[in-house]
């Protein structure tokens, strides 16, 4: 009896962890291919992540505006915000990766440009997410749908703030480190 209970618990635990570990990839196959092509170029990689992240916000606006998508709209917005947040995390990971890596003079220059573009993009993203939150709080229909995505919206706003702060901090470090340009 005890062995059967232990086996049942073990199976339940294995099934639960396998489902918990499955997250859908926010990138399409084509987007993943584009990223692979520029894997060693910090600037192009950051530009692509910004483009893909912006596309999630554009899709979110389309879902909100399309009356045909009214059914399940809150869940669709939730999923797009989740994808957006995952992509913002990828931007953070790339910032960390390239900040800690010795870069050639040209790559460091490109990284600086990428940092500036991340800051500008984060300001845009922040404004768009703030607008979504305002609509979700003030529009009666959207308020009902917002129950499905308000928590994820807050996560997205936190992620944007984190990315913007990180890019600003790294930009200051890169500007103050002239020796980094002389290393290669």
Spans of features found by a protein language model:
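Hydrophobic h-region of N-terminal signal peptides that target proteins for export
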Residues: 11-20
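Long, charged/polar, soluble alpha-helical segments
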Residues: 21-184
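Sec-dependent signal peptide recognition
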Residues: 2-10
């Amino acid at each position: 009896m005890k062995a059967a209970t232990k086996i049942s618990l073990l199976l339940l635990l294995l099934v639960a962890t396998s489902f918990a570990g499955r997250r859908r990839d926010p990138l399409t196959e084509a987007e993943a291919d584009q990223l692979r092509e520029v894997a060693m170029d910090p600037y192009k990689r950051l530009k692509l992540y910004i483009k893909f992240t912006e596309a999630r916000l554009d899709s979110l606006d389309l879902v909100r505006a399309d009356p045909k998508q009214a059914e399940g709209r809150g869940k669709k917005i939730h999923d797009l915000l989740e994808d957006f947040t995952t992509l913002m995390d990828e931007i953070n990971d790339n910032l960390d990766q390239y900040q800690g890596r010795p870069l050639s003079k040209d790559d460091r220059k490109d990284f600086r440009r990428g940092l500036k573009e991340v800051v500008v993009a984060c300001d845009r993203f922040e404004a768009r997410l703030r607008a979504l939150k305002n609509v979700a709080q003030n529009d009666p229909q959207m308020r009902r749908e917002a129950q499905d995505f308000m928590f994820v919206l807050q996560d997205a706003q936190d992620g944007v703030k984190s990315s913007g702060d990180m890019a600003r901090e790294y930009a200051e470090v890169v500007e103050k480190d002239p020796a980094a340009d002389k290393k290669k």
